[in-house]
């Protein structure tokens, strides 16, 4: 039996990244009982405002040191939120991703009687990610929450191992797809299969493994294209990528550029050496792209092996190369994977995610 939908306020105060797109997708399916608190400094703020959703805009900061020097704004932000909660009779506040300031307003929100829900994306920091240094502070948000939501069983397990007190109030949902479009059905006519490595270039993303896998596949005589798109340090990998004729876009891509880049490729490749779950997988599936990934973290929960993508046998260049070779050589498999991605778009839709979040009223977390 379907429960009554909670009147919900979603909070995301980050400036850029996949959660901005996550929020835009939520605004498309939100009902009249839904509010969104968004930073005016968000790179997609204009697009979010134009969505027509009910927005509670706040001023945060545009540079890292603003987290400290901008704290004087927090009192005003707190008043804005509490007024909105009262005016719209909000039942539930959902933090889509903790911000350095959200632990400071958690207690005030809970005192209104609204349930405070925090989505935890990572149980601990990722190697090479500078935001890892604030992970312990951000965890204060989860520890204050009435309920914690993770997007994979892997993260829930790691989170409870670190904070056993969260076991009774943590639930697992799923990472919804972003920008659902029709699956391509295989390689574009008249050109080789294209593989894309996408997103911020950080140590845990395993770009060296991707490059080595491509070198192995090229040595086997296979014809394919590759692209690398995202900001981060390439170092000596730049020369090796050039030797592979890779198309390199080594910077942050804006919203429209993402669509242009992804439309040029047939398969996303993740060669992570560590992962929680991945917004890149959610984006790829939204674009109808199968995903090849290493068997780490929650990636094996997002990607259904031989249904919506391929999971390499192990975290090694030759294993990734084997999976990529299978994708290149087996046209029937490519068609099968595209059909599987279409099913993922349905099963992991943002509409289902929104429904699950807003209908879980006051039930005890299982």
Short names for language-model regions:
Residues 305-306, 310-317, 324-332:
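Conserved acidic donor-binding segment of nucleotide-sugar-dependent glycosyltransferases
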Residues 20-25, 193, 202-216, 282:
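A conserved mid-protein helix/loop that constitutes part of the nucleotide-sugar donor-binding site
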Residues 263-276, 289:
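Acidic donor-binding loop of glycosyltransferase active sites
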Residues 326, 333-347:
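A short, well-ordered alpha-helix in the C-terminal region of glycosyltransferases
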Residues 236-259:
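Nucleotide-activated donor-binding/catalytic signature segment of Leloir-type glycosyltransferases, i.e.
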Residues 144-183:
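Donor nucleotide-sugar binding/catalytic pocket of nucleotide-sugar-dependent glycosyltransferases
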Residues 93-114, 276:
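An aromatic- and histidine-rich active-site surface loop
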Residues 12-17, 24, 28-73, 99, ...:
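N-terminal strand-loop element at the rim of the active site
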């Amino acid at each position: 039996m379907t429960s009554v939908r909670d009147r919900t306020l979603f909070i995301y105060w980050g400036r850029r990244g996949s959660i901005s797109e996550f929020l835009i997708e939520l605004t498309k399916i939100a009902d009249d009982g839904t509010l969104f608190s968004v930073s005016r400094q968000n790179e997609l703020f204009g697009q979010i405002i134009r969505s027509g959703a009910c927005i509670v805009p706040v001023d945060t900061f545009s540079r890292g040191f603003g987290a400290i020097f901008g704290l004087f704004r927090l009192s005003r932000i707190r008043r804005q939120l509490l007024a909105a909660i009262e005016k719209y009779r909000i039942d539930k506040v959902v933090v889509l991703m903790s911000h350095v300031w959200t632990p400071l307003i958690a207690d005030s929100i809970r005192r209104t009687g609204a349930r405070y829900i925090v989505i935890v994306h990572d149980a601990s920091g990722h190697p090479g990610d500078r935001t890892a240094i604030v992970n312990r502070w951000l965890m204060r948000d989860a520890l204050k929450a009435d309920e914690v939501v993770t997007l994979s069983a892997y993260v829930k397990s790691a989170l409870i191992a670190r904070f056993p007190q969260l076991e009774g109030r943590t639930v697992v949902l799923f990472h919804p797809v972003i920008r659902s479009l029709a699956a391509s059905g295989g390689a574009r006519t008249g050109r080789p299969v294209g593989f894309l490595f996408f997103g911020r270039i950080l140590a845990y993303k395993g770009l060296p493994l991707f490059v080595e896998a491509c070198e192995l596949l090229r040595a086997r005589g296979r014809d394919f294209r590759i692209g690398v798109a995202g900001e981060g340090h390439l170092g000596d990998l730049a020369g090796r990528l050039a030797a592979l004729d890779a198309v390199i876009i080594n910077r942050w891509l804006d919203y429209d550029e993402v669509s242009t880049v992804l439309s040029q490729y047939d398969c996303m490749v993740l060669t992570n050496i560590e992962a929680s779950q991945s917004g890149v997988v959610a984006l790829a599936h939204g674009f109808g792209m199968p995903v090849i990934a290493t068997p780490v973290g929650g990636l094996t929960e997002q990607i259904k092996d031989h249904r919506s993508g391929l999971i390499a046998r192990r975290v090694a260049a030759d294993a990734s190369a084997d999976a990529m070779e299978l994708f290149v050589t087996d046209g029937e498999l490519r068609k099968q994977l595209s059909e599987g991605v279409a099913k993922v778009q349905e099963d992991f839709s943002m509409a289902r995610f929104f429904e699950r979040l807003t209908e879980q009223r006051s039930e005890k977390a299982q």
